């Protein structure tokens, strides 16, 4: 039986997904992970859904092709995922795709807020990353431990941009 358990990863090859908890930067930066620069922060919609039907987004930290951390998030409410994302403020649509300037984490009540400033034309404003659920247009990270880990990365590495992929 042990032989089969050891062969399974070899047989499945790259189709085995890495659990977020296994990613080297999931809990925050280490001195070794901060070496080398070239960090990119992005977020993307997935095909996955939270139990209540809201779309799962992923906030991901990469160095080149290597995924260092991945945190589940939400943006927009379930019924508004295909609404106009660029020109209709207040419609609960997800964050528009594009490049954003990322502010440093700052206190927001008992939580954290990262300001997001679009680097493209849009009528959307007051955008950010914060802890909430469900999302109503910002990037909402439901778990406190996840937003705290992201804050440690942003503070320690100086990341100042976020790409919304899709």
Identify the role of each PLM range.
Residues 4-5, 89:
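Hydrophobic alpha-helical context, especially transmembrane and signal-peptide helices
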């Amino acid at each position: 039986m042990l032989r089969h358990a050891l062969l399974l990863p070899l047989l499945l090859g790259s189709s085995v997904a890495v659990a977020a908890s296994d990613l080297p930067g999931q809990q925050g930066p280490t001195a070794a992970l901060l070496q080398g620069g070239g960090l990119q922060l992005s977020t993307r919609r997935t095909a996955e859904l939270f139990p209540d039907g809201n779309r799962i987004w992923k906030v991901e930290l990469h160095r080149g092709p290597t995924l260092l951390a991945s945190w589940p998030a939400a943006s927009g409410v379930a019924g508004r995922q295909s609404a106009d994302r660029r020109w209709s403020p207040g419609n609960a649509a997800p964050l528009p795709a594009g490049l954003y300037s990322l502010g440093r984490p700052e206190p927001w009540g008992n939580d954290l807020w990262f300001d997001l400033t679009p680097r493209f034309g849009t009528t959307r404003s007051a955008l950010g990353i914060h802890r909430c659920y469900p999302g109503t247009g910002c990037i909402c990270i439901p778990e406190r431990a996840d937003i705290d880990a992201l804050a440690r990365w942003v503070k320690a590495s100086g990341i100042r941009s976020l790409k919304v992929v899709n």
